[in-house]
Curated annotation (Swiss-Prot):
UniProt gene name: hjc
Enzyme Commission numbers on file: 3.1.21.10
Organism: Pyrococcus furiosus (strain ATCC 43587 / DSM 3638 / JCM 8422 / Vc1)
Gene Ontology terms describing biological process: DNA recombination; DNA repair
Name of protein: Crossover junction endodeoxyribonuclease Hjc
Recorded consequence of changing Y56A: 30% HJ cleavage
Residues noted as binding Mg(2+) in the record, renumbered to the chain: E9, D33, E46
Pfam families, per the entry: Hjc (PF01870)
Length: 123
């Protein structure tokens, strides 16, 4: 699964760069996978890939992401590539202890970045 994860990270780097973000990949750091910024918004991203229709992410993984993001001054983001659906993103909250992530739990990259609004009118 490492190869799929690294490939997904590189794919997400290209998507973020298309939207004007500078991106650094932090392979093997055990903290975050990507750090991205555009001078206005800074994202600390944990990247996951799954063939399933859901993904369980534990408290420990989210705790590392949240703590790094707090220290860095960025937004903690979980990016999941569902192989049969595509990319979905969610801002991670410290209140979450364990989380089952499904495609309907997240938003598109454009909504996350504030480029596109959701049907509820939220950006």
């Amino acid at each position: 699964m490492y190869r799929k994860g690294a490939q997904a990270e590189r794919e997400l780097i290209k998507l973020l760069e298309k939207h004007g973000f500078a991106v650094v990949r932090s392979a093997g750091s055990k903290k975050v996978d990507l750090v991205a910024g555009n001078g206005k918004k800074y994202l600390c991203i944990e990247v996951k890939v799954t063939k399933k229709d859901h993904l369980y992410v534990g408290k420990r993984d989210m705790g590392r992401l949240i703590e790094f993001s707090r220290r860095f001054g960025g937004i903690p983001v979980l990016a999941v590539k569902f192989l049969n659906v595509g990319w979905r993103f969610i801002e991670v909250s410290p209140k979450i202890e364990k989380f089952v992530f499904t495609p309907s739990s997240g938003v598109s990259l454009e909504v996350l970045l504030g480029i596109q609004k959701t049907l509820e009118g939220k950006s």
